[in-house]
Amino acid sequence: GRPWEQIRLAVAYPKLNVKIVATHCGISVGEDGASHQALEDMALMRALPNMVVISPADAHETYAATLAIAEYDGPCYMRLGRSDVPVILPEDVSFTIGKASVLRSGKDVTLIGTGQMVDACLEAAKMLEGQGISAEVINMSTIKPLDSETVLGSVKRTRCCVTAEEHSIIGGLGSAVADLVASEDPVPVMMVGTRDTFGESGAPADLMKKYGLTADDIVKAAKDAVSKKPRRWWRR
């Protein structure tokens, strides 16, 4: 729309030192419905040259990311939701633009989450562990520039991955990871996110379940990814 065009021409094109913080992003906005649920914002901002795109995992990382983008000389977009998000990172967590963090090591599948889906990835990893699958969890708080080194290093070990985002799978984290992996080290990539759809009004937890954005959905995707690995990689 018109605001995006203004950001494109008046901020990204001249590479101005402007910081944009968006709230009420994702399906968990809840009762406000489709008109208020931004499910394509990361795709729109990621497509803009010069634009940094941030999606922090919790309150502590949001604070650290705010300090980091304030020091960065250039346009930045930071994405926040509306609903309460569990605190999963320490209060003194560090934040570097373009750097992901491995929250849990594993050898069978890589789970890459952003925003509040990082917590769901950690929960899914525990569930998978009980089923004999070792999952590595990556907090990808910077969508652009993507931390290609961390992603490729992880999938080199696990040989498959799942991305999880409270956003459309078109143009967001999943697309970014799939683009990278397809060109550098092709492995199965499964995406957890909304599917070419608008949202609707409802309780946040109910909407997360309906649109397939829960730990159970990540577990299912992880099993699917593992099943698609070449057999020589499974349980090496």
Question: Where is each model-derived feature located?
Answer:
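Conserved thiamine diphosphate
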Residues: 1-110, 135, 226
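Thiamine diphosphate
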Residues: 29-30, 79-236
